[in-house]
Amino acid sequence: MVIDPVTLSQELISFPSITPTDNGAISFLSDILSQYGFTCHILDFGDDTVTVRNLYAYRGTEEGPNLCFAGHTDVVKTGDLTKWKFDPFSGHIEDDILYGRGAVDMKSAICAFIAAVSRINFNEVPGSISFLISGDEEGDHFQYGTPSVLKWLNENNHKIDYCIIGEPTSKSFLGDTIKVGRRGSVHFKIICNGIQGHVAYPHFAENPIDNMVSILYKICNTTFDTGNEYFQPSNCEIVSVDTGNTSKNVIPDTIVAHINIRYNNIHTAESLFDIINNICAQVTPKYQLLQSVSGEPFFNQPNQYSDMLSSAIKKVTGQDAIASTSGGVSDSRFIKNVCPVIEFGLKNETAHKIDEHVPVKEIYQLADIYTEFIKQFFNLSTT
């Protein structure tokens, strides 16, 4: 029996799986996939404060290649419910548009791939198809999602040969963009120290704000690079600056700034640390610099599989897709250490927004694209 991807999307959206809470979404998918012959493993990882529920499901033979679809069932918070046209967890359809939290990012893509798989004759598949579904990609406990599942796969001798992630990569229209890599993301915490004092007696104090202003000015006027063929120039943004001082007549003794750099493969987090550290040292010796790396940049050279995906998109939509490395980090930063990975999904315009929505036509088209890609991947009949 072939699955309707829109109906399935409505059902999956109805689970309020706000990260890292699952609320039954993973078990629902496990039940569906089990009905279609998949061996399903529900995997719980976490610590004393949180448990993240994940799913790994597979079907086929171990003798051929494994094509994995990766995604996440967790969604971001809804925001002000009174601003939504419809209940964000109702899966409401109005004027052929599906509304709901996760409609774009990325429950509909999961359902589209499941629908695609339901159309495949597994007797003809010379390999296997799998699903790696994380319960926390959006939140702070992502380490208990995809990274933990990948570790489990390795420990239990499960292989993945190629992975497609259903992140919403499209911009203006479905199929205009596929992601063949991602920029890196590094966060810096800069602390400048001074001497607290009365604003009327600055000679008895040392204002750390002066040094921080100089440091941030130098950072903002630094050209880290000019980009390359596949990546845009690295970009730095000041996220916050704070002294924690609520008094109007006191010079603070400390100021803290947070900056984020999205960087290309010309740099590493280590090389950027050296640049920022050097700038701070030029201004003052009274500083501390702390670094947190969300992911290093990576790039997958175009290959036969990305060509297959482009061909599938062209066949269904008539459009030519471009390969891109723009946007934020995703779970591809973990999966790329295991196998080649590509990302393709719906338009991202309303992701994380009030009234997140997608035309139902595009969900059907996405399922058609995924179906065509699977057939080309395994060299199945495309008639």
From Swiss-Prot:
Zn(2+) 2 binds at residues 105, 138, 352. It catalyses: N-succinyl-(2S,6S)-2,6-diaminopimelate + H2O = (2S,6S)-2,6-diaminopimelate + succinate. GO terms for molecular function: acetylornithine deacetylase activity; cobalt ion binding; succinyl-diaminopimelate desuccinylase activity; zinc ion binding. The active site is at residues 74, 137. This is Succinyl-diaminopimelate desuccinylase. Pathway: Amino-acid biosynthesis; L-lysine biosynthesis via DAP pathway; LL-2,6-diaminopimelate from (S)-tetrahydrodipicolinate (succinylase route): step 3/3. GO terms for biological process: diaminopimelate biosynthetic process; L-arginine biosynthetic process; lysine biosynthetic process via diaminopimelate. Its EC number is 3.5.1.18. HAMAP family: DapE (MF_01690). NCBIfam families: dapE_proteo, PRK13009.1. Pfam families: M20_dimer, Peptidase_M20. SUPFAM superfamilies: Bacterial exopeptidase dimerisation domain, Zn-dependent exopeptidases. Zn(2+) 1 binds at residues 72, 105, 167. Belongs to the peptidase M20A family. DapE subfamily. Binds 2 Zn(2+) or Co(2+) ions per subunit. Keywords: Amino-acid biosynthesis, Cobalt, Diaminopimelate biosynthesis, Hydrolase, Lysine biosynthesis, Metal-binding, Zinc. Coiled coil: none annotated. CDD domains: M20_DapE_proteobac (cd03891). It comes from Ehrlichia ruminantium (strain Welgevonden). It is an enzyme of class 3 (hydrolase). Gene3D superfamilies: 3.30.70.360, Zn peptidases. Its cofactor is Zn(2+); Co(2+). It comes from the Bacteria. Homodimer. Catalyzes the hydrolysis of N-succinyl-L,L-diaminopimelic acid (SDAP), forming succinate and LL-2,6-diaminopimelate (DAP), an intermediate involved in the bacterial biosynthesis of lysine and meso-diaminopimelic acid, an essential component of bacterial cell walls.
